[in-house]
Amino acid sequence: MNSIFPQYSFDRSQIRWSDYLKDLTPVEEYGGVKFKREDKFAPLGFNGVNGSKMRQCLWLVDEWVKTKNITGIVSGSVVGSPQHPFISSICKHYDLGCLIVTGSKHYMKHTNMILAHRMGAQFKVEKIGYARALQSKAFQLAKKLPGHEVLETNITVDERLNPPERIEAFHKIGSYQVANIPDDIETMIIPCGSCNSVVSILYG
């Protein structure tokens, strides 16, 4: 199965992932049900990191690179989160440092942490492993690291930390994807966790 990317490479001299942020993923029909294939937003191929959260994560990093000329990103989330391979692969694409805050001494037993390690991420182990505590530690560490930004837990933009125009821009990048949803669709079933993708869809 193919993704929407014409080639798969970390090398920005070969391909810039951000050029495809607004490209539409296809709608495909199986057994009379139509699926919006967000899993085909896959810059490293169909079996690699993919999806709408990957797109939003890429947008965040691309904005930081363009507006702040950052040198690295600090991220804190639970060991099982796909946030880890997302941010580490994007940092590798942009040649940025990636520091992941974890609450597990045995983080290398977890698949997403192994993937992040392979992408070049470094790790800081803390005593508390709850998501909110890890994000707090990430912000503390970023203050000590020049040129670093924090990827918020769940790849979101908290209204307490971000101005309204940034929150709107964050959701706008996902909102474009409704453009090719067929007009005859009457009912949409949307899986949700953090609800970021849901908000983007509704905004679109």
Label every model-predicted segment.
Residues 2-71:
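Positively charged, low-complexity intrinsically disordered leader regions
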Residues 62, 89, 93, 203-204:
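Short, well-ordered alpha-helices that flank and scaffold nucleotide-derived cofactor binding pockets
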Residues 105-183:
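Small/polar-residue-rich loop-to-helix segments that shape phosphate-bearing ligand pockets
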Residues 192-204:
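Conserved mixed alpha/beta catalytic, RNA-binding, or beta-rich assembly cores of soluble enzyme
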